Amino acid sequence: SIAAVALAAAGVLSARSVMQAPAPGEGEKKLIDLKSDLMGPVAPGDSVVFLVGNFAAQHNGAVITCDSAVRYSDMRIEFFGNVLINKNTTYIYGDRAEYDGDVNEARVYSDIIKVVDGDATLYTYKFLFNTKSNVGEFDDGGVMLNRENLLESVRGYYYADTKELIAVDRVEMRNDEYELKGDSVVYDMTTDNAFFFEHTNIWNKDGDYLYADRGAYDKLDTLYI
């Protein structure tokens, strides 16, 4: 199960500098900071506001830029065109995004969404990212490329702080040393080590085959434990 896997796994700089908001008091919810060249109501007397031109938003330390945006309320915004969400080393690229500041979640949409973190790049179609926990997820198929490694799965959970990807459901992972197929894998993006769970088939470059329900691949020593 996902819970078991999780337990086992144990150009934006200017926008960021412009929007330094004071820290909220204890128990106070931090609002979304916004800036743009132009803004105005979508319709006369409407509280919904359209923003365009050098737009940027900031919340929980994440900076979001795009071509234009619509603010529906103080905590709910929709972004259009060349959307970029950046927090620390994570960069998320898409065509459109919806952000709900009450739950700290950005839902990103595009024909192909790209999530870049150092050498690792994740490609998917829909991506949910929490700007407070720094955890993202996809459930419609995703592919991660990291140096010589390729990892595919139907669902996945990206942990920006620990540099891990939990891949779930029809997982395939391969590089020059081995190919792995299984139900779930925890992949360390820094070390390239992988922890696998349940119904895992592994073939190495020499043609050797291994089946396991639980184990680990150590990149440094090329060991299957």
Label every PLM stretch briefly:
Residues 13-225:
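N-terminal amphipathic/hydrophobic interface segments
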Residues 1-11:
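Bacterial N-terminal signal peptides
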